[in-house]
Amino acid sequence: MIPLTSITDPVTDPGLAVSCRGIRKHFGEGETRVEALRGVDFTARAGELSFLVGPSGCGKTTLLSVIAGILDPSGGDLTVLGERVDALSARDRILFRRKNLGFVFQQYNLLPALTAAENVAVPLLAAGARRPPSLERAEALLDRLGLGARTGALPATLTGGQQQRVAIARALVHEPRLVVCDEPTAALDHESGESVMELLADNVVRPDRAVIVVTHDSRVLHHADSIARMDDGRIVNTTRPGDSLPAATQRST
């Protein structure tokens, strides 16, 4: 069992990619108030692939959205890649996310008028990179994900699983230091899911990078460096490879 809190300083410890201390998030007020996160303590280390598992509605996606800066926490301390994100101005927060983070959410949001390769290259082109090498890198990533023959296809002609792989390639193309993924293998068969997880694992070979994955897919848990289980808006346990998972964790991933 791993302690749920860290005694290190998340701002000065280069090994901590993400540090959540007492993170709370609620929606609504009064009788409609819902406590989605109830004082979450969670860390993700650089050079590791961290998983969040637990029953539907337990707060996994909300926590991921807070870490990604899409939702503001209602309370607690959040440090991402050494930055106290809540202390940044709105503009600096956007620039920080654009430079350092990659996102894979269940809504792929592919641009319908662009090809698969062009969609993947968007982060590079938005940062001012030249078009030919950007497309070349995009095509190489798509090829690794089994879409080498579909790089010129429009999103409307792709299956849901193919669109998901395009979104994953887009999240990785600019080599972000932190990648957050919500159910990245949900629409994929086992072989495609393994290709995705291998690509994500490759991203953490460098010690300054980290990946956080929310999943219900127990088939991919063997890729994890750590597995944190959530229930009712809290982290209830964290395990490492070789630890035996509690039965409840195995049932509710």
What spans do the regions from the language model cover?
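ABC-family P-loop ATPase nucleotide-binding domain
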Residues: M1-H26, N237-T253
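ABC family nucleotide-binding domain
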Residues: L16-M230
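H-loop (His-switch) and adjacent beta-strand-loop-beta switch element
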Residues: I227-R240
